[in-house]
Amino acid sequence: MIDRRSKVAIFGDILRTIEKKNGKAKPTHILYGANLSHDRLKMHLESLTSQGFIEKMSENGQTFYVLTNKGKEFLSGFNKMERYFDAFGVQI
């Protein structure tokens, strides 16, 4: 049986991908980095944007997503929580 990632784990993967791109990433980079389909990526980006974890911006006709301070705080807490759960063999 294949375990599916939780919504929180997907959020963490998206935010981590943006962070790895110096806090600013194109949707395609996020799509591959977080291993999501286009439809699921769109849904999660809208959710993260509406919650204030990321901001959508355009530059020279290209769309980027930028990590906000709230997103950085969430990612920091998520990373700590993930390490804690990993220590006990629990998958998020």
What positions do the PLM features span?
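Short alpha-helical segments that sit at the start of domains
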Residues: 1-15
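A short, conserved structural fragment
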Residues: 49-59
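Basic, amphipathic "hinge/linker" alpha-helix immediately C-terminal to the N-terminal HTH DNA-binding motif
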Residues: 60-77
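Short amphipathic alpha-helical interaction segments
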Residues: 35-50
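Amphipathic alpha-helical dimerization/coiled-coil segments
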Residues: 76-92
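Short, locally clustered residues in the helix-turn-helix/winged-helix DNA-binding domain
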Residues: 15-22, 79
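Short acidic, hydrophobic short linear motifs in intrinsically disordered regions
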Residues: 23-33
